[in-house]
């Protein structure tokens, strides 16, 4: 799995979670059970943590990133579509995030 330590922070992967061989997961990232990170997706937990809930999938080419003081939480049973950029936000359980969506810090999607 393409998991990268940043400082003292190493991604944590839940049971049966899957990360595509060319995805990038770096730093303070926690993947829930049965989560999946698809081709060319990037999750950068470099400023604050990223939490991906159980049974959630981050589809191809999406980028998830945090700002200092603005962590990211993606709920359970969420589909983040292809080429989505999420930046320091919260996505509620079961929420779909459409293709090519852009969300800036502190926004909440429910």
Tell me what each language-model feature is.
Residues 10, 106-107:
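Low-complexity, intrinsically disordered short peptide segments enriched in small/polar/basic residues
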Residues 96-98:
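Acidic, proline/serine/threonine- and glycine-rich low-complexity intrinsically disordered segments
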Residues 100-106:
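Conserved small/polar residues in nucleotide/adenosyl-binding loops
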Residues 1-94:
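Domain-scale signature associated with acetyltransferase and cell-envelope carbohydrate enzymes
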